[in-house]
A protein has these predicted regions:
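Conserved luminal/periplasmic juxtamembrane motif of membrane-embedded glycan-processing enzymes
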Residues: 1-194, 206-210, 222
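Active-site-proximal, structured, solvent-exposed surfaces of multi-pass membrane proteins
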Residues: 172-292
Length: 292
């Protein structure tokens, strides 16, 4: 704790910054700061050190060439990942501002200097929850080159073969020509296209998250949240199947019009443990009564 001269200062500054950041639920990124600033800011952060991780992150990240062990540390050069994961702001320090400018793409605009941090706003930010026009299958996705897969994921949703059969009717198969045009310029256009269909409201809750959207047609709504069997999704109050997409994230089918979406999380096994507990309770009471 005391071995790094500025560690305590950065964490104290982060607590102050938490009160000064704009309202809303979105992700942040950091550059050359100490680990886990997101915990102090109460924000999901791309740069994270911890021994626990959602299992599906261990398939999603490696498919993009991002190492995930006890640390998540996507390189700044993987710019498209920031749009895909709804990163709105990046934090760095005054000491590393010049180095950040040298490495960053042109999509970051200076926002402010607050509480010891220099903030940059992502000009290609896409709010949490958005739809696509195209899809491709996991087999097609795995045939593409790894370095530009993040760009591809801003253009098309990756479905399993089974889900492509069941849900492909709501999307168009990605044309072959679109597999190759993966430039930064096209990325900015893809972000604009995704932003046009993004949720109008997104809020983290104590049990998961809530979102609202208005769609001109039935479509799959994508959320860059790791897939987990503990989630239950409700669209307009009706329980809805959750699809595992992009080799580890989630999507749900939404009808045309105004929709409300709620994801509620219970750790896998909780329901079973409650049943077992209730079944065992009479036996326990008999046991206690016998020896009373």
């Amino acid at each position: 704790w005391n071995t790094d001269s500025d560690l305590v200062e950065q964490y104290i500054n982060a607590l102050a910054l938490k009160e000064d950041l704009p309202e809303g639920d979105w992700r942040i990124d950091t550059y050359k700061t100490h680990d886990n600033l997101g915990l102090w800011l109460d924000k999901s952060c791309l740069q994270y050190f911890g021994s626990t991780a959602a299992p599906n992150i261990l398939s999603f990240y490696p498919a993009l060439g991002v190492k995930r062990d006890v640390r998540s540390q996507p390189e700044l050069s993987n710019y498209a990942l920031r749009g895909l994961l709804s990163v709105r702001y990046l934090l760095t320090t005054l000491a590393h501002q010049k180095q950040f400018h040298a490495e960053a793409d042109e999509g970051w605009a200076y926002y402010d200097t607050l509480d010891g941090y220099v903030l940059y706003e992502n000009q290609n930010y896409v709010p949490m929850g958005f739809t696509y026009d195209y899809y491709l299958t996991e087999a097609q996705y795995e045939d593409t080159v790894t370095p530009t897969r993040s760009n591809l994921l801003m253009r098309a949703l990756v479905l399993t073969e089974e889900d492509a059969v069941a849900y492909g009717q709501y999307l168009t198969p990605l044309p072959t020509a679109e597999l190759n045009d993966l430039t930064y310029t096209r990325y900015t256009q893809d972000c604009a296209d995704r932003r046009a269909s993004a949720c109008t409201a997104f809020e983290m809750t104590s049990a998961g998250f809530h979102a609202e959207a208005t769609l001109d047609r039935a479509n799959l709504m994508f959320f860059s949240v790791p897939y987990d069997d503990g989630f239950t999704a409700y669209v307009n109050g009706q329980e809805t199947e959750i699809l595992r997409v992009d080799e580890g994230l989630m999507a749900v089918l939404c009808p045309a019009g105004t929709v409300t979406i709620d994801f509620v999380y219970q750790p896998d096994g909780i329901r079973l443990s409650r049943t077992v507990t209730l079944a065992a309770l009479p036996v326990f009471l008999l046991y206690i009564g016998h020896f009373a």
